[in-house]
Amino acid sequence: MSLVPASLPARRSAARIDFAGSPRPTLGVEWEFALVDSQTRDLSNEATAVIAEIGENPRVHKELLRNTVEIVSGICECTAEAMQDLRDTLGPARQIVRDRGMELFCAGTHPFARWSAQKLTDAPRYAELIKRTQWWGRQMLIWGVHVHVGIRSAHKVMPIMTSLLNYYPHLLALSASSPWWGGEDTGYASNRAMMFQQLPTAGLPFHFQRWAEFEGFVYDQKKTGIIDHMDEIRWD
Protein backbone atom coordinates (compact mmCIF):
# COMPACT_ATOMS: atom_id res chain seq x y z
CA MET A 1 0.00 0.00 0.00
CA SER A 2 1.52 3.30 -1.09
CA LEU A 3 1.79 6.15 1.39
CA VAL A 4 1.82 8.69 -1.46
CA PRO A 5 -1.41 8.73 -3.53
CA ALA A 6 -0.64 8.73 -7.25
CA SER A 7 -3.60 11.06 -7.78
CA LEU A 8 -1.77 14.01 -6.22
CA PRO A 9 0.91 15.05 -8.73
CA ALA A 10 1.08 18.61 -7.36
CA ARG A 11 1.81 17.32 -3.87
CA ARG A 12 4.42 14.99 -5.28
CA SER A 13 6.15 17.87 -7.01
CA ALA A 14 6.16 19.96 -3.82
CA ALA A 15 7.47 17.02 -1.81
CA ARG A 16 10.36 16.21 -4.12
CA ILE A 17 13.76 15.98 -2.41
CA ASP A 18 16.88 16.40 -4.51
CA PHE A 19 18.99 13.29 -4.06
CA ALA A 20 22.75 13.83 -4.06
CA GLY A 21 23.79 10.50 -5.49
CA SER A 22 27.30 9.15 -5.17
CA PRO A 23 28.87 7.85 -8.41
CA ARG A 24 30.52 5.08 -6.40
CA PRO A 25 30.05 3.60 -2.90
CA THR A 26 31.55 5.86 -0.21
CA LEU A 27 31.28 6.22 3.54
CA GLY A 28 31.83 8.78 6.25
CA VAL A 29 31.81 8.35 10.03
CA GLU A 30 30.74 10.64 12.88
CA TRP A 31 31.99 9.53 16.31
CA GLU A 32 30.65 11.18 19.46
CA PHE A 33 32.85 11.29 22.57
CA ALA A 34 31.92 12.37 26.07
CA LEU A 35 34.41 14.34 28.15
CA VAL A 36 34.97 12.85 31.61
CA ASP A 37 37.07 14.13 34.49
CA SER A 38 40.21 12.00 34.90
CA GLN A 39 39.74 11.75 38.68
CA THR A 40 35.99 11.62 39.29
CA ARG A 41 35.00 10.05 35.94
CA ASP A 42 31.98 12.33 35.95
CA LEU A 43 31.06 14.28 32.83
CA SER A 44 32.79 17.59 32.18
CA ASN A 45 31.10 20.47 30.35
CA GLU A 46 34.34 21.65 28.75
CA ALA A 47 33.74 20.91 25.06
CA THR A 48 33.73 24.60 24.11
CA ALA A 49 37.21 25.12 25.57
CA VAL A 50 38.54 21.90 24.05
CA ILE A 51 37.26 22.74 20.58
CA ALA A 52 38.64 26.28 20.87
CA GLU A 53 42.10 24.90 21.69
CA ILE A 54 41.95 22.45 18.81
CA GLY A 55 41.23 25.41 16.54
CA GLU A 56 39.47 25.57 13.19
CA ASN A 57 39.13 21.97 12.11
CA PRO A 58 36.33 20.62 9.90
CA ARG A 59 36.87 17.21 11.50
CA VAL A 60 35.88 18.38 15.02
CA HIS A 61 32.32 19.44 15.84
CA LYS A 62 30.28 20.53 18.82
CA GLU A 63 27.13 18.65 19.77
CA LEU A 64 23.89 19.16 21.70
CA LEU A 65 25.60 18.97 25.10
CA ARG A 66 28.74 20.79 26.18
CA ASN A 67 30.18 17.53 27.50
CA THR A 68 30.51 16.15 23.97
CA VAL A 69 33.05 16.42 21.16
CA GLU A 70 32.34 14.85 17.79
CA ILE A 71 35.13 13.58 15.54
CA VAL A 72 34.19 13.10 11.88
CA SER A 73 35.90 11.63 8.85
CA GLY A 74 35.87 12.92 5.33
CA ILE A 75 34.23 11.07 2.45
CA CYS A 76 36.14 7.79 2.24
CA GLU A 77 36.40 4.95 -0.25
CA CYS A 78 36.69 2.15 2.32
CA THR A 79 36.52 1.35 6.03
CA ALA A 80 40.31 1.35 6.47
CA GLU A 81 40.55 4.86 5.03
CA ALA A 82 37.79 6.10 7.34
CA MET A 83 39.48 4.56 10.39
CA GLN A 84 42.80 6.19 9.56
CA ASP A 85 41.09 9.52 8.96
CA LEU A 86 39.51 9.34 12.41
CA ARG A 87 42.83 8.36 14.04
CA ASP A 88 44.58 11.35 12.49
CA THR A 89 42.12 13.71 14.21
CA LEU A 90 41.61 11.72 17.38
CA GLY A 91 45.30 11.60 18.39
CA PRO A 92 45.87 15.36 18.78
CA ALA A 93 42.38 15.88 20.21
CA ARG A 94 42.93 13.22 22.87
CA GLN A 95 46.19 14.87 23.95
CA ILE A 96 44.50 18.24 24.38
CA VAL A 97 41.74 16.61 26.41
CA ARG A 98 44.25 14.83 28.67
CA ASP A 99 46.27 17.98 29.19
CA ARG A 100 43.09 19.52 30.58
CA GLY A 101 42.62 16.70 33.10
CA MET A 102 39.99 14.79 31.16
CA GLU A 103 39.58 11.64 29.10
CA LEU A 104 37.47 10.79 26.07
CA PHE A 105 34.67 8.37 26.89
CA CYS A 106 32.76 6.37 24.30
CA ALA A 107 29.59 4.48 25.23
CA GLY A 108 25.87 4.75 24.61
CA THR A 109 25.26 6.46 27.97
CA HIS A 110 27.23 7.47 31.06
CA PRO A 111 26.78 5.05 33.99
CA PHE A 112 26.08 7.57 36.75
CA ALA A 113 26.07 11.19 35.51
CA ARG A 114 22.91 13.24 36.09
CA TRP A 115 21.30 14.75 33.02
CA SER A 116 20.14 17.78 35.01
CA ALA A 117 23.78 18.81 35.61
CA GLN A 118 24.65 18.99 31.91
CA LYS A 119 24.83 22.23 29.94
CA LEU A 120 23.39 22.76 26.48
CA THR A 121 25.46 24.06 23.59
CA ASP A 122 24.37 27.56 22.60
CA ALA A 123 23.15 27.14 19.02
CA PRO A 124 19.79 27.82 17.31
CA ARG A 125 19.30 24.24 16.09
CA TYR A 126 19.80 22.82 19.57
CA ALA A 127 17.53 25.43 21.14
CA GLU A 128 14.84 24.47 18.64
CA LEU A 129 15.31 20.77 19.43
CA ILE A 130 14.78 21.38 23.13
CA LYS A 131 11.84 23.67 22.44
CA ARG A 132 10.15 20.89 20.47
CA THR A 133 11.06 17.93 22.71
CA GLN A 134 11.15 19.58 26.16
CA TRP A 135 11.74 17.17 29.09
CA TRP A 136 12.76 14.24 26.92
CA GLY A 137 15.10 16.35 24.84
CA ARG A 138 16.91 17.62 27.94
CA GLN A 139 17.53 14.03 29.01
CA MET A 140 19.41 13.02 25.87
CA LEU A 141 22.57 12.04 27.74
CA ILE A 142 23.53 9.66 24.93
CA TRP A 143 26.33 9.17 22.40
CA GLY A 144 26.69 7.19 19.22
CA VAL A 145 28.59 6.43 16.03
CA HIS A 146 26.92 7.42 12.78
CA VAL A 147 27.94 5.95 9.43
CA HIS A 148 26.92 7.76 6.25
CA VAL A 149 26.92 5.72 3.05
CA GLY A 150 26.99 7.15 -0.45
CA ILE A 151 24.45 5.54 -2.81
CA ARG A 152 24.21 6.09 -6.55
CA SER A 153 20.43 6.30 -6.94
CA ALA A 154 17.46 7.23 -4.75
CA HIS A 155 15.70 4.11 -6.01
CA LYS A 156 18.21 1.96 -4.12
CA VAL A 157 17.76 3.66 -0.74
CA MET A 158 14.58 1.99 0.52
CA PRO A 159 15.55 -1.58 -0.46
CA ILE A 160 18.86 -1.08 1.36
CA MET A 161 17.11 0.36 4.43
CA THR A 162 14.67 -2.56 4.49
CA SER A 163 17.53 -5.04 4.34
CA LEU A 164 19.37 -3.29 7.16
CA LEU A 165 16.25 -3.19 9.34
CA ASN A 166 16.10 -6.98 9.12
CA TYR A 167 19.47 -7.02 10.89
CA TYR A 168 18.75 -4.21 13.35
CA PRO A 169 18.53 -6.55 16.38
CA HIS A 170 21.89 -8.07 15.49
CA LEU A 171 23.56 -4.69 14.99
CA LEU A 172 22.10 -3.40 18.25
CA ALA A 173 23.29 -6.47 20.14
CA LEU A 174 26.83 -6.02 18.80
CA SER A 175 26.97 -2.31 19.66
CA ALA A 176 25.01 -2.20 22.94
CA SER A 177 27.07 -0.43 25.61
CA SER A 178 24.66 1.38 27.92
CA PRO A 179 23.11 -0.79 30.65
CA TRP A 180 23.37 1.90 33.34
CA TRP A 181 21.46 5.16 33.73
CA GLY A 182 21.76 7.59 36.62
CA GLY A 183 23.66 5.04 38.71
CA GLU A 184 21.09 2.28 38.25
CA ASP A 185 21.17 -0.93 36.24
CA THR A 186 18.31 -0.50 33.77
CA GLY A 187 18.07 -4.16 32.79
CA TYR A 188 18.62 -3.18 29.15
CA ALA A 189 21.88 -3.73 27.30
CA SER A 190 21.18 -0.56 25.32
CA ASN A 191 19.33 1.98 27.41
CA ARG A 192 20.52 4.50 24.82
CA ALA A 193 18.10 2.98 22.30
CA MET A 194 15.27 3.15 24.85
CA MET A 195 15.99 6.81 25.62
CA PHE A 196 16.49 7.96 22.03
CA GLN A 197 13.21 6.50 20.80
CA GLN A 198 11.31 8.81 23.16
CA LEU A 199 11.95 11.70 20.78
CA PRO A 200 9.12 11.98 18.23
CA THR A 201 11.52 12.08 15.27
CA ALA A 202 13.95 9.41 16.49
CA GLY A 203 13.99 5.65 16.96
CA LEU A 204 13.47 3.18 14.12
CA PRO A 205 12.49 4.45 10.66
CA PHE A 206 9.13 3.65 9.16
CA HIS A 207 8.94 1.03 6.42
CA PHE A 208 8.93 2.79 3.06
CA GLN A 209 8.89 0.83 -0.17
CA ARG A 210 9.82 3.69 -2.47
CA TRP A 211 11.74 6.97 -2.26
CA ALA A 212 8.55 8.86 -3.17
CA GLU A 213 6.92 7.57 0.02
CA PHE A 214 9.76 8.97 2.08
CA GLU A 215 9.45 12.31 0.24
CA GLY A 216 5.76 12.37 1.07
CA PHE A 217 6.46 11.62 4.72
CA VAL A 218 8.98 14.47 4.99
CA TYR A 219 6.57 16.82 3.23
CA ASP A 220 3.80 16.00 5.72
CA GLN A 221 6.16 16.44 8.68
CA LYS A 222 7.07 19.91 7.44
CA LYS A 223 3.50 20.83 6.53
CA THR A 224 2.23 19.99 10.00
CA GLY A 225 5.08 21.81 11.74
CA ILE A 226 6.69 18.75 13.28
CA ILE A 227 10.01 19.59 11.60
CA ASP A 228 11.43 22.50 9.64
CA HIS A 229 14.27 20.64 7.93
CA MET A 230 14.76 17.05 6.84
CA ASP A 231 17.87 16.65 9.02
CA GLU A 232 15.64 16.97 12.10
CA ILE A 233 14.59 13.37 11.46
CA ARG A 234 17.07 11.40 13.55
CA TRP A 235 16.29 7.75 13.01
CA ASP A 236 18.66 5.07 14.28
What are the language-model segments listed below?
Residues M1, M83, M102, M140, ...:
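Detector for methionine-enriched segments
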Residues C76-T79, G150, A154:
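Short strand->helix junction
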Residues V147:
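An acidic/histidine-cluster motif and surrounding catalytic segment
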Residues S2-W143, W235:
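Terminal catalytic/cofactor-binding subdomain
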Residues D122, R152-D236:
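Loop-rich catalytic cores of soluble enzymes, especially ATP-dependent carboxylate-amine ligases
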